[in-house]
Swiss-Prot record:
Entry EC number(s): 7.1.1.-
Protein name as annotated: NADH-quinone oxidoreductase subunit D
Protein keywords: Cell inner membrane, Cell membrane, Membrane, NAD, Quinone, Translocase, Transport, Ubiquinone
Subunit structure comment from the entry: NDH-1 is composed of 14 different subunits. Subunits NuoB, C, D, E, F, and G constitute the peripheral sector of the complex.
A single Gene Ontology CC term: plasma membrane
This protein's encoding gene: nuoD
Organism lineage: Bacteria, Pseudomonadati, Pseudomonadota, Alphaproteobacteria, Hyphomicrobiales
HAMAP family: NDH1_NuoD
Record's function text: NDH-1 shuttles electrons from NADH, via FMN and iron-sulfur (Fe-S) centers, to quinones in the respiratory chain. The immediate electron acceptor for the enzyme in this species is believed to be ubiquinone. Couples the redox reaction to proton translocation (for every two electrons transferred, four hydrogen ions are translocated across the cytoplasmic membrane), and thus conserves the redox energy in a proton gradient.
Predominant localisation class: membrane
């Protein structure tokens, strides 16, 4: 009997694979159907965001953050705004805080619907994306009614938010909440007890709590492994400390637990949105939405027609920008994908000296090899989907 040399073979997954979630290229080493090694090749969407921010004023830097995790844009702007406000020592009025929190939670739902439904599609369920995207469309319209843009909003700015919300919009967001919970029930009815869906997700991509912390996981990836770590609760920012919500936690750390947590988080987000809507249409119905510091926040149009000082301030703020006192600061928010952090170094000028962006997806993607080793080729898409990766923030 002749001897044969058996060797592993290598295949490319992506960068134009339908379930590669953007421009990801994975080099997979396979032993038959079993994955031996996963080598992510990133950088295909690198745009030099951090360097570009150094050449722009603090206000002009805001739109770059929309283009990182472009599924939930306002959450990124929020982190940058918090960092700059810390350096400036600004206080945001309560109405402005509530609007920020409301739209952060809308962003969370936008992201989770996208992830849960497309991950279901990757493992063979075709109906959830159709239902989920109908709801995403309604949320995109809320974005558009707040700031004029469906995606790249540039709405959350250092000092507050760009404009106040009209009362009809706040009411419509309130009316959207309960019917959406019914849609979530319908999606859960399709997936949660579905035999095929469970076979594709239960005990796939298991990560223990120690490993999750060692790899630098945050967000759903840590909560799926059993830690109730959520920055909205553990390091509260804005008015989250005044709001009531629960933090769903898994116990197995597999793809299925992460799916269940995302579903439950959407319900918690609706709970937060309802509280914000109640306050915005009740106790905080009227009030400023931005800081009253005229050296940072531009004046209203009406003021500019009456006051020469307002006109001068407006001109200076939009040409030169405001100067931020020298110092360094790290601000993080609980973005839908995990802890999104911004480390800003200011040198006293009108532009950031350095702006380091800590994207949660970057830490999650580096663990692909660890998570997929020993699984079958078909499980790679299930694991990748449950990591919730968007390439805008990974490549920056």
């Amino acid at each position: 009997m002749t001897e044969h040399n058996v060797r592993n073979f290598t295949i490319n997954f992506g960068p134009e694979h339908p379930s590669a979630h953007g421009v990801l290229r994975l080099v997979l080493e396979l032993d038959g159907e079993i994955v031996e090694r996963v080598d992510p090749h990133i950088g295909l969407l690198h745009r030099g965001t951090e360097k570009l921010i150094e050449t722009k004023t603090y206000l002009q830097a805001v739109p770059y953050f929309d283009r990182l995790d472009y599924v939930a844009p306002m959450n990124q702007e929020h982190a940058f705004a918090l960092a700059v406000e810390k350096l400036l020592g600004l206080e945001i009025p309560m109405r402005g805080q509530l609007i920020r929190v409301l739209y952060s939670e809308i962003g969370r739902i936008l992201s989770h619907i996208m992830n849960v439904t497309t991950q279901a599609m990757d493992v063979g369920a075709m109906t959830p994306p159709v239902w989920g995207f109908e709801e995403r469309e309604k949320l995109m319209v809320f974005y558009e009614r707040a700031c004029g843009a469906r995606m790249h909003s540039a709405y959350v700015r250092p000092g507050g938010v760009h404009q106040d919300l009209p009362p009809e919009l706040v009411d419509d967001i309130g009316k959207w909440c309960d019917p959406f919970l019914t849609v979530l029930d319908n999606i859960e009815g399709l997936l949660t007890d579905n035999r095929i869906y469970k076979q594709r997700n239960v005990d796939i991509g298991v990560v223990s709590l120690e490993d999750a912390f060692a790899w630098g996981f945050t967000g759903v990836m840590v909560r799926g492994s059993g830690a109730a770590w959520d920055l909205r609760r553990s390091q509260p920012y804005e008015c989250y400390s005044d709001l009531e919500f629960d933090i769903p936690v898994g116990k197995n750390g597999d793809c299925y637990d992460r799916y269940l947590i995302r579903m439950q988080e959407m319900r918690e987000s609706v709970k937060i949105m309802k509280q914000c809507v109640d306050r915005l249409s009740g106790k905080h119905r009227i009030g400023p939405v931005s800081s009253l510091d005229g050296k940072v926040v531009p004046p209203k149009r009406g003021e500019m027609k009456r006051s020469m000082e307002a006109l001068i301030h407006h001109f200076k703020l939009y040409t030169e920008g405001y100067h931020v006192p020298a110092g360094e600061v790290y601000a993080a928010v609980e973005a839908p994908k995990g802890e999104f952090g911004v480390y800003v170094v200011a040198d006293g000028s009108n532009k950031p000296y350095r702006c380091k962006i800590r994207a949660p997806g970057y830490a999650h993607l580096q663990a692909m090899d660890f998570l997929c080793k020993g699984h079958q080729l078909a499980d790679v898409t299930a694991v990748l989907g449950s990591l919730d990766i968007v390439f805008g923030e990974v490549d920056r």
